[in-house]
């Protein structure tokens, strides 16, 4: 019997994500789990995507990303790590909006909420983030 794994996609863009946010997503969803052998199937199918598949600067590290935003069309859950110093590309914002409209679960870590706001996904909704990053 084959069971479909839950598809999780982490979204990156050059200078957009914090390294700790990416590490958390990788550890939670991308790392092998000891219990997977007990359950008989892996828990998640984990993918990282970006607008232009290429090396993406995350903190002081270049992350080699092989998948484009088309990966979002197959996602069950989309992860937005904490936001870095650059705004997300419009192509990513549009892809997030399409994923949301399809009913995909979208999760942000910390200041990743700003990316959701820039995509218009928080319009009229309460949201939280770190208070020390608020400027208005």
Q: For the regions a protein language model found, what residue spans apply to each?
A:
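Structural detector of well-ordered beta-strand residues that form the stable sheet scaffold
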Residues: 106-107, 128
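A conserved active-site-flanking secondary-structure segment within enzyme catalytic domains
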Residues: 123-136
């Amino acid at each position: 019997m084959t069971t479909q794994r839950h598809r999780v996609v982490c979204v990156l863009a050059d200078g957009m994500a914090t390294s700790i946010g990416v590490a958390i997503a990788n550890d939670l969803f991308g790392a092998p789990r000891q219990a997977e052998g007990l359950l008989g199937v892996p828990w998640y199918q984990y993918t990282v995507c970006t607008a232009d598949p290429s090396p993406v600067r995350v903190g002081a590290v270049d992350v080699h990303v092989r998948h484009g935003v088309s990966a979002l069309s197959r996602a069950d859950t989309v992860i937005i790590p904490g936001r870095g110093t650059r705004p997300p590309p419009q192509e990513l914002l549009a892809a997030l909006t399409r994923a949301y409209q399809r009913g995909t679960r979208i999760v942000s870590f910390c200041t990743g909420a700003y990316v959701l706001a820039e995509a218009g996904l928080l319009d009229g909704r309460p949201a939280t983030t770190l208070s020390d990053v608020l400027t208005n």
